[in-house]
Amino acid sequence: MTGMNIQSEGLLFIQKNEIRMKDFLFPQPTDSKSFSLLLLCLRLFFGLMFLLHGLEKLYNYTELCFVFPDPMNIGSEISLLFVIFAEMLCSIGFMAGALFRLSMIPMLIVMITAFFHIHGASIVQGELAFIYLMVFIMMYISGPGQYAV
């Protein structure tokens, strides 16, 4: 092998890696099926997590009924019932993609209230509420995707 062949093979290797690096750094838009599958996975994961929070509140209903925070001045029990409705029934609609944006409105209200009123807009104290809020806002904007009821 001459020096010229080694140099041209090295240049070819670099060019191939540049293409791969370019594809990695600047990927092409994904097709709608893979994006819809991603939205489905996000809906199922965050919806199930939200549903579990609602089940915990339903399970401890009698203890929480009188001590649940009431930031909207509608009563502790009504606030708790609204949160259980949002976290259980609306999360099922969220996961299924049925009446998607309509089912997200109570979920967004609960997370906005939790983050700004209960946790005082502190990311340190209200980290989970902030994560749910950001995911729900992005999902509200993007819609449920193709894999929805």
Predicted features and spans:
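Extended, low-polarity transmembrane helix blocks
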Residues: 5-59, 77-85, 92-149
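Perimembrane loop-to-helix junctions flanking transmembrane segments
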Residues: 64-77
